[in-house]
Amino acid sequence: MAKTTKVKGNKKEVKASKQAKEEKAKAVSSSSSESSSSSSSSSESESESESESESSSSSSSSDSESSSSSSSDSESEAETKKEESKDSSSSSSDSSSDEEEEEEKEETKKEESKESSSSDSSSSSSSDSESEKEESNDKKRKSEDAEEEEDEESSNKKQKNEETEEPATIFVGRLSWSIDDEWLKKEFEHIGGVIGARVIYERGTDRSRGYGYVDFENKSYAEKAIQEMQGKEIDGRPINCDMSTSKPAGNNDRAKKFGDTPSEPSDTLFLGNLSFNADRDAIFELFAKHGEVVSVRIPTHPETEQPKGFGYVQFSNMEDAKKALDALQGEYIDNRPVRLDFSSPRPNNDGGRGGSRGFGGRGGGRGGNRGFGGRGGARGGRGGFRPSGSGANTAPLGRSRNTASFAGSKKTFD
């Protein structure tokens, strides 16, 4: 039993040792398992790490490959991109060149448009400037024309003023015999501007000739006097008024136009363009204002005794004649401007010698043979008788007439 017990004990001890061994083994196994597990885990981890490393390496390799591939791809892509970029750059360069060309074209167009616009603007500006110049020229012309018109108007006004400022004289006719200078002046004093009045008398007598003259300061007063006094009764008789003004300027124009030059000075004046109605006494009174008048002569036709349209006024000296010529040149006498000039002095000899077979000399004493008495001569010779008939039937001087003798029979009628 004891053996059995020992055996059982041994068995138990064996079992326990086995169990311990098993437990140890289990523990070892567990530890080993743990270690194995750890190792496995480590291995696993290592494997995992390796796998991971491998994977990483593979991944890295793959990555490297991929990177290489990607790099190659990227390189290819880069190359393609480069090519594309080159192409794009070339295209961009082309496009840029095209764009530049287009820009240049646009710039040229812009420049052309600018030039055209500038040319248009310049042309428009030039046209505007030309139009402005034309307008300015037109304005200048208008201003010049206006100035000329103003000058003409001012000159006309000056001439009118000068004409109005010049003294004027009116003729007063149909006066009463009893009216004298003072009476005539008083009748016109209410008009204003009266300088003086004079009544024309017959020479050597105190008898009025029925007319006179009234002098005014200017033409306006004279015209007013004619308007107001025409037909007015003075001393029971209606008077007649008319303008009688002097215009020396007109005669000066005539002298310039026709080249009239005065002759050598003398004490006698020649009066040309004299009215046929000119009165000798009126001429005497007019010229006596400028000097001592000796005589007034108005030649007439011997047959009709009508004036010839000219006359002579003789002064006592040459200075008075010069004064009268300067003052009265172009003076209106009976509404006609008279032309004055110095007259050559008349010869003071006793007369010329009468010519034979002609008229006697001017102023000669007695006419010659077969002549008439000279002009102003005492008695002309009696004209001779010419038996030869008229001058048409007479033979030339120094030759005898050759006439055929009558050889026919004479017939008589009973």
UniProtKB/Swiss-Prot annotation:
GO molecular function: G-quadruplex DNA binding; mRNA binding; nuclear localization sequence binding; RNA binding; single-stranded telomeric DNA binding
Annotated spans, RGG-box: 353-384
Post-translational modification: Methylated by HMT1, forming asymmetric dimethylarginines (DMA) within a domain referred to as an RGG box, made up of repeated Gly-Gly dipeptides interspersed with Arg and aromatic residues.
GO biological process: chromosome organization; DNA recombination; maturation of SSU-rRNA; ribosomal small subunit assembly; rRNA processing
Biased composition (Acidic residues): 96-105
Domain RRM per the UniProt entry, residue ranges: 168-246, 267-345
Localisation per UniProt entry: Nucleus; Nucleus, Nucleolus
Family named by the database record: Belongs to the RRM GAR family.
Biased composition (Low complexity): 27-44, 54-73, 118-128
Anything else known: Present with 77400 molecules/cell in log phase SD medium.
Species per Swiss-Prot/TrEMBL record: Saccharomyces cerevisiae (strain ATCC 204508 / S288c)
Protein name per Swiss-Prot or TrEMBL: Nuclear localization sequence-binding protein
InterPro entries attached to this UniProt entry: Euk_RNA-bind_prot, Gar2_RRM2, Nucleotide-bd_a/b_plait_sf, RBD_domain_sf, RRM_dom
Induction of its expression: In response to low temperature (By cold-shock).
Annotated stretches, region: Disordered: 1-172, 244-264, 336-414
